[in-house]
């Protein structure tokens, strides 16, 4: 079995490996609430543009 046959051969239909950030394709720190599907770093960058307001 060569590398081409083994690379990404495992099915990724659920779990962390199946989801990624819609902005930067990162798989860590993903915020899925409200269908955001953004990592926390990108969320902080785009939160104001999306319409989120930081409360005191």
Swiss-Prot record:
User: Subcellular localization, per the record?
Assistant: Cytoplasm, Cytosol; Cytoplasm; Rough endoplasmic reticulum
GO molecular function terms listed in the Swiss-Prot or TrEMBL record: structural constituent of ribosome; zinc ion binding
Cross-referenced InterPro entries, in alphabetical order?
A: Ribosomal_uS14, Ribosomal_uS14_CS, RIbosomal_uS14_euk_arc, Ribosomal_uS14_sf
A family per Pfam = Ribosomal_S14
Q: Keyword annotations for this protein?
A: Cytoplasm, Endoplasmic reticulum, Metal-binding, Ribonucleoprotein, Ribosomal protein, Zinc
List the GO biological process terms.
cytoplasmic translation
Cofactor, free-text remark: Binds 1 zinc ion per subunit.
Magnesium found in the keyword field: no
Q: Which residues bind Zn(2+)?
A: 21, 24, 39, 42
Give the domain of life: Eukaryota
| Required co-factors | Zn(2+)
Q: What is its main location?
A: cytoplasm
Annotated GO CC locations: cytoplasmic side of rough endoplasmic reticulum membrane; cytosolic small ribosomal subunit; ribosome
Give the protein's biological function.
Component of the small ribosomal subunit. The ribosome is a large ribonucleoprotein complex responsible for the synthesis of proteins in the cell.
The family classification in the record reads:
Belongs to the universal ribosomal protein uS14 family.
Q: Can you state the subunit structure given in the record?
A: Component of the 40S small ribosomal subunit.
| Designated name of the protein | Small ribosomal subunit protein uS14
């Amino acid at each position: 079995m060569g590398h081409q046959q083994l690379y990404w051969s495992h099915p990724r239909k659920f779990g962390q490996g199946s989801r990624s950030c819609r902005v930067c394709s990162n798989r860590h720190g993903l915020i899925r609430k409200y269908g955001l599907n953004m990592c926390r770093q990108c969320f902080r960058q785009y939160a104001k543009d999306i319409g989120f307001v930081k409360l005191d």
